[in-house]
Structures are given as structure tokens and as C-alpha cells.
């Protein structure tokens, strides 16, 4: 079966738009030093991000996450909660320096149960 010229032309015109939308929305996970490993224990994580850069932060805690939320928003960027276990931080373009935000997570692990506050400190440079 052969594709008509009109359908082929439409696919050529539309396909680049789909590709650019998908690539514009993708963000990578940033390496974090010092992150939570058990429920009920507060922790702090440190990471680097360029001005205007975006990082994904999946919560990797052994067990089941019952709930999570943004506790403190960053002063020099935007923090979004994508789902119960993943957050996305975008640094403001043109800003360089530290930025801090906190998330709260509640759940049950193999040995502990409770609520933890995870504070993340970005070095925007």
C-alpha cells in the first residue's frame, strides 16, 4: 500500500513539531550528594545546575511513599511536583548563586515509618 503525497507532506510538516515538543519537555536527573534513604529521617542534598537549567529529583526511598509535598519553594527558581515521587527544579535564567528548597515525604519502609523533610541546596553556576 502506497502513501499518498498529501499524507506524506502532512507528516513531514507535523513530525518536527512533535519532536521539538518532546525534547523541550525532557529534563535530566541531576546528581545529588547526600540524599534521604529512610523514612522518618530528615536530610540535605547538594547539587549543581546551570542558570536556566532543569533537574529532575526522583525520591529513591526503599518502601512505599504515601504522600509528598513541597514544603519550601526556591527563591531563585521554580519547583514543580510531577507526581508523588518526582520533583522538577528549574533555576532562573541569569541567576548565579545558592538556592534552597524543601520537600516533605511520608511513607513506610522495611525498617522505619514516618515523615521526612528533604532540603535541597542548589549551586546555580
State where each predicted segment sits.
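Residue-level recognition of well-ordered beta-strand positions that form the cores
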Residues: 90, 104-106, 121
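Surface-exposed or secretory-pathway low-complexity segments enriched in glycine-proline
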Residues: 47-85
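C-terminal edge beta-strand
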Residues: 25-27, 109-125
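C-terminal segment of classical bacterial N-terminal signal peptides
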Residues: 14-23
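A short beta-strand micro-motif common to beta-rich folds, especially ectodomain repeats
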Residues: 96-109
